[in-house]
C-alpha cells in the first residue's frame, strides 16, 4: 500500500516521502496516529499544497523537543532513595516510572515512555547514566544517583 508520510517514521522515511508499506501497518498504526495518509491523487495534491505548513510544524516540534532536552541535561543528576541490602543490591528495582517521577519532581516534566533503560531496570546502589528520548531525533542524559535509605 502506498502512503505519504506526514511525520518522520523510524526505519521508513521522513516528511513527504511516498513509501510502500503493508496494508495492516498503514491501516492500524500509521493512519490512526496521523503519521501517514494513503497516496491517492487527491491526497498527493492536498499534501503538496500544505507541505510548507507541515514542515514548519515539524520544525516547531523539533525545536520544542530540543528545548526540553536542554532542560533535562541541565539537571545533571537526580537522587533516588530506595531500600537496599548490605552489598548495595536494592530490594526491588527502580524502573522507568520511578525515574520519570524523580525527574518530574526535580522540575522537568518527563513521561515514563521517554525513559530509555537499555540494560534493564536499576538494581544496584550507585550512579547510573539514563537516556531520555524526547523526540525521534533528540536525546538527553541524566545521571541517576541511587542511594540506600
Curated annotation (Swiss-Prot):
Q: Which GO terms are recorded in the biological process aspect for this UniProt protein?
A: translation
Its GO CC terms are: ribonucleoprotein complex; ribosome
Q: Does the keyword Hydrolase apply?
A: no
Q: Which Pfam families match?
A: Ribosomal_L9_C, Ribosomal_L9_N
InterPro entries, A to Z: Ribosomal_bL9 (IPR000244), Ribosomal_bL9/RNase_H1_N (IPR009027), Ribosomal_bL9_bac/chp (IPR020594), Ribosomal_bL9_C (IPR020069), Ribosomal_bL9_C_sf (IPR036791), Ribosomal_bL9_N (IPR020070), Ribosomal_bL9_N_sf (IPR036935)
Q: Name one GO molecular function term.
A: rRNA binding
Q: Which UniProt keywords apply?
A: Ribonucleoprotein, Ribosomal protein, RNA-binding, rRNA-binding
Tell me where on the tree of life, at the top rank, the source sits: Bacteria
- Similarity comment: Belongs to the bacterial ribosomal protein bL9 family.
Q: What does this protein do?
A: Binds to the 23S rRNA.
Q: What is this protein called?
A: Large ribosomal subunit protein bL9
